[in-house]
Amino acid sequence: MESPRGRPGPETDLLALGEQQAAIFGDGPGQTPSERPSDLRLSEDEEAENVGGASCHPKASLKTSSCSFVHPPEWEAPEDKPGRGGTFSGAGSRLGAPDPEFDLHGSSRRKDPEPPEAKPESERVCRRGSPVGGGMDVEQKEDDNEAAEAGRGGRSFSSRLQDSRSLDGLSGACGGPASSGGAESGAGGGRRATISSPLELEGTVSRHGDLTHFVANNLQLKIRLSGAPQPPPPAPTRPCSAPTPTPAIPPIDPDVLRDLERLSRELGGRVDRLLRGLGGAVQELTALSVGCIQTYRDAVDSLGEAVDMSIKGMYTLLARCEELERALQPVQGLARQVRDIRRTLEVLEALCK
């Protein structure tokens, strides 16, 4: 029993509505009451909202079932088209909240969904539908938003548990069939919260196969803040304590004071004598040092004078030698003459013999 005839008006009899539900859920040809129509496959989030809607307002089940109809064949496989997964989330398209006897038959095939969040009264009224044909689109959009909120609420607990895991664990959890199925059943093709949403708040997460790459935002600023010295903790203010009682001072013996004064004077006299002796020794050492310096100076002066005198005597000797050489030049002439005279005498002696 399909819905080409549209939604019935509010004046439709309740008996006719009950027969319509029986024909949809189990009285159709080739179907048992416990079977669900094969052309209507709901996602886990939509089933969770069906259960939540049935538990919140069971009295409105007949009213919401009045807008039930079978979608065309292109809406039969929402898992193949992730963007169209929210088309079955309307109040009429999800067949409303079935009666308790039909819910018992279909509960064996459903997973136990998490209880959805409590809906405000305004949303409950909007989900009951209206006789106007354009109201179904508004209800479908609202139910799409509700399905997205239910999906985020269902994954918030698991995302908190997985926040402390490593990137490999996150990539394995995000790459599993559960996360892909949840992404396919997203409402209206919108982005749904995944298990890595805490990481996406702190940076950019990209996946390539089984690997998950994470790039932190403002990495230099975070490194600079982590390396900044922390301010020292404030010093704890000490509470004003009661003044401690001063210990009682025993009486002082005057003899002790006199002995102390005498010993102090003796010590002062000894220190003065020591300082005088030290000063005399320093003066003697200073005088000795001055005498040594003067003696060294006199020795250097006398040595310089002696060297100067020796140099002057050498030059004088050289001058005298030159004068002597000049004076001996005539003697050489006389020596030649003497040799000549001697040769002449020898010749004469030879003639005389």
Curated annotation (Swiss-Prot):
It comes from the Eukaryota. The modification Phosphoserine is found at S130, S166, S197. It is found in: Lysosome membrane. Keywords: Lysosome, Membrane, Phosphoprotein. Residues 23-194, 225-253 are annotated as: Disordered. Residues 172-191 have a biased composition (Gly residues). The keyword Membrane applies. One of its GO terms (cellular component) is lysosomal membrane. The keyword Membrane applies. The modification Phosphothreonine is found at T194. Residues 229-253 have a biased composition (Pro residues). One of its GO terms (biological process) is lysosome localization. Residues 102-126 have a biased composition (Basic and acidic residues). It holds the Pfam family BORCS6. Its main location: membrane. Disulfide bonds: none annotated. As part of the BORC complex may play a role in lysosomes movement and localization at the cell periphery. Associated with the cytosolic face of lysosomes, the BORC complex may recruit ARL8B and couple lysosomes to microtubule plus-end-directed kinesin motor. PANTHER family: BLOC-1 RELATED COMPLEX SUBUNIT 6, BLOC-1-RELATED COMPLEX SUBUNIT 6. Component of the BLOC-one-related complex (BORC) which is composed of BLOC1S1, BLOC1S2, BORCS5, BORCS6, BORCS7, BORCS8, KXD1 and SNAPIN. Belongs to the BORCS6 family. This is BLOC-1-related complex subunit 6. It comes from Bos taurus (Bovine). The lineage of its organism: Eukaryota, Metazoa, Chordata, Craniata, Vertebrata.
